[in-house]
């Protein structure tokens, strides 16, 4: 019943990076040899065996009834040894190309992947790419002060991936803005996001009836609605009350799942202001997945940086305040980089 070297017992990663499994002590009335394996996701067939001698587990004799015996093993022994390689760390917003809209986008990572392939680099680390919009100003440009640990920043969407507007005059207007923003020596954060937000609304109004019926969209929504609905509600309330400080949101100041369900109900006459965030996150997920798959196909790993903590005016602080010490702050002392110090 333990597998007999042919049928692996699947372990849980619910406590990642630890992998765990519970087994009956009745199975261990004699010494047991075992190894760890990596299995394929689709059929659970063994893809890789760990190297080295078999691991050995001696019989467990419980001192009292209902005893628990815990075994902590060493790490998986990869047959090719531990990975070692060089990489590059870069903010996505700095990867502007001729195809960009004034800022580096997920689509632009492809060219960095190609460069890594040419130079022998094996890993790309990007600065945080989560949504940071709290004030709709340049203050939101700091990538480490996100309003969510789940949603991605709409700024990184490659607009052609959403489709073209049917209005040719509008497309010409956006192309002119794109060229102007792309020609500037620095990222015009406010200008980029103002223009992109306008495009998002126009393309959403045009294509949402069809996109909302796509099976791929419906699967995305069902798989992510636990965080997607609170995120969309947060963005709507942020704009409605003109602040990301949820403590000023009157009856919504204290998170209530029932109120959020009412707020995100498709029958609401303002539902388009909710659904546009679903729409953006669907395409962000799609475009990022495509570029990560492209990187993997070239033998380049993708790695993301994350902030040290959450913003006090964030979705997680609103929905799960019991998980955080919201009276605490973190930062760094003064140095040559920031002579006044930093308050993160």
Which residue ranges define each predicted feature?
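Aromatic-rich carbohydrate-binding modules that target alpha-glucans
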Residues: 1-30, 37-62, 101, 139-144
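A generic structural signal for short, solvent-exposed coil/turn residues
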Residues: 2-3, 13, 28, 49, ...
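Short, conserved beta-strand segments within well-ordered enzyme catalytic domains
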Residues: 35-37, 125
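Short, well-ordered strand-loop elements centered on a beta-strand within folded domains, enriched
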Residues: 45-50, 65-71, 245
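Extracellular beta-sheet/turn segments enriched in Thr/Pro/Gly and aliphatic residues
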Residues: 55-78
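Acidic/aromatic-lined carbohydrate-recognition and catalytic surfaces
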Residues: 77-321
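Active-site-adjacent "gating/activation" loops or surface patches in catalytic cores
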Residues: 316-344
């Amino acid at each position: 019943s333990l597998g007999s070297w042919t049928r692996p017992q699947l372990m849980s990663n619910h406590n990642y990076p630890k992998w765990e499994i519970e087994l009956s002590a009745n199975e261990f009335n004699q010494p047991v040899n075992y190894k760890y394996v990596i299995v394929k996701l689709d059929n659970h067939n063994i893809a890789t065996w760990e190297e080295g001698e078999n691991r050995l587990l001696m019989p467990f004799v419980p001192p009292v009834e209902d005893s628990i015996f815990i075994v902590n093993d060493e790490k998986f022994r990869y047959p090719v040894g531990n990975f070692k390689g060089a990489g590059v760390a870069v903010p996505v917003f700095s990867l502007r190309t001729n195809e960009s809209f004034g800022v580096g986008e997920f689509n632009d990572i492809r060219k960095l992947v190609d460069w890594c392939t040419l130079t022998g680099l094996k890993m790309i680390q990007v600065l945080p790419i989560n949504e940071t919009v709290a004030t709709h100003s340049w203050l939101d440009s700091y990538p480490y002060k996100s309003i969510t640990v789940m949603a991605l920043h709409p700024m990184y969407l490659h607009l052609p991936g959403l489709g073209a507007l049917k209005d040719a005059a509008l497309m010409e207007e956006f192309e002119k803005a794109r060229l102007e923003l792309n020609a500037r020596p620095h990222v015009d954060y406010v200008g980029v996001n103002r223009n992109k937000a306008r495009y998002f609304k126009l393309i959403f109004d045009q294509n949402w009836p069809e996109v909302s019926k796509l099976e791929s969209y419906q699967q995305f929504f069902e798989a992510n609605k636990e965080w997607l609905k609170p995120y969309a509600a947060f963005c709507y309330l942020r704009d409605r009350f003109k602040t990301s400080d949820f403590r000023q949101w009157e009856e919504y100041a204290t998170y209530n799942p029932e109120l959020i369900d009412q707020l995100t109900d498709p029958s609401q006459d303002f539902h388009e202001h909710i659904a546009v965030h679903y729409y953006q996150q669907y395409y962000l997920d799609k475009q990022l997945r495509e570029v990560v798959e492209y990187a993997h196909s070239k033998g380049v790993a993708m790695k993301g940086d994350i902030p040290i903590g959450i913003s006090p005016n964030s979705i997680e602080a609103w929905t799960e305040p019991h998980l955080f010490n919201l009276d605490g702050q973190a930062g760094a002392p003064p140095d040559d980089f920031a002579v006044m110090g930093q308050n993160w």
